[in-house]
């Protein structure tokens, strides 16, 4: 496939024939691909793999048609796999010619691999704010930025611990809804 629209057109013309790799059944890639299918109006078959490298090898070998993967794989397997879209809300600086999913015509909520820092419940709000400020400062150090770029990561901090809690709630809500609709979790 040369583009997301080609992939979607193929899937719609050949119902049930598109297969896509997932890192474990019910993982983030599986849930996001299920959400994308619902929004774009096609249905494919999830093929589970033990991890990203196995899935990339499945794409290269033609065992699967596509797979949602972290950016490091696009960078590592350059020339062997074709990135079709960035799932985030903006193009990725390391692959500037690859459009976002929205630019490709699928208006799915943006997605990214993300993580966060947590502290014990009941942590003094002043201490939480100080930790957040320290993380913001460290995240701008040139050595930290260089390390993240070298491993195909971007760092975007929320502005406050409260915003991070809201992100957690939002992510859990869509994952629960998609997982339940796909029969991956009990309703």
What is the predicted role of each segment?
Residues 1-54, 101, 114-147:
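Hinge/capping helix and adjacent helix->loop/strand transition within the periplasmic-binding protein
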Residues 16-19, 38-50, 54-65, 152-158, ...:
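A local structural motif
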Residues 19-21, 67, 84:
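Short, well-ordered beta-strand segments
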Residues 32-34, 57, 95-99, 159:
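Short, well-ordered secondary-structure micro-motifs
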Residues 34-39, 53-67, 72-80, 169:
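Short helices/loops that flank or line small-molecule/ion binding pockets
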Residues 39-42, 126-187:
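An extracytoplasmic/periplasmic, membrane-proximal ligand-sensing/linker region
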Residues 49, 68-69, 86:
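Short beta-strand and adjacent tight-turn residues that come in two discontinuous sequence segments
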Residues 72-140, 170:
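C-terminal lobe and pocket-closing loops
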């Amino acid at each position: 496939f040369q583009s997301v629209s080609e992939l979607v057109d193929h899937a719609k013309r050949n119902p049930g024939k598109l297969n896509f790799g997932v890192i474990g059944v019910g993982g983030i890639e599986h849930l996001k691909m299920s959400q994308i299918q619902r929004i774009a109006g096609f249905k494919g078959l999830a093929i589970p793999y033990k991890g990203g490298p196995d899935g990339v090898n499945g794409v290269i070998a033609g065992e699967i048609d596509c797979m949602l993967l972290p950016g490091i794989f696009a960078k590592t397997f350059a020339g062997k796999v074709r990135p079709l879209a960035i799932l985030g809300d903006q193009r990725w600086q390391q692959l500037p010619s690859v459009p976002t999913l929205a630019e490709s015509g699928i208006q799915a909520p943006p997605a990214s691999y993300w993580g966060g820092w947590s502290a014990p419940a009941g942590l003094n709000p002043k201490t939480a704010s100080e930790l957040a400020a320290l993380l913001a400062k460290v995240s701008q150090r040139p050595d930290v930025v260089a390390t993240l770029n070298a491993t195909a990561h971007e760092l975007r901090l929320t502005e406050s611990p409260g915003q991070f809690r809201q992100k957690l709630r939002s992510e859990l809500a869509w994952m629960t809804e998609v997982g339940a609709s796909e029969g991956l979790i009990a309703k």
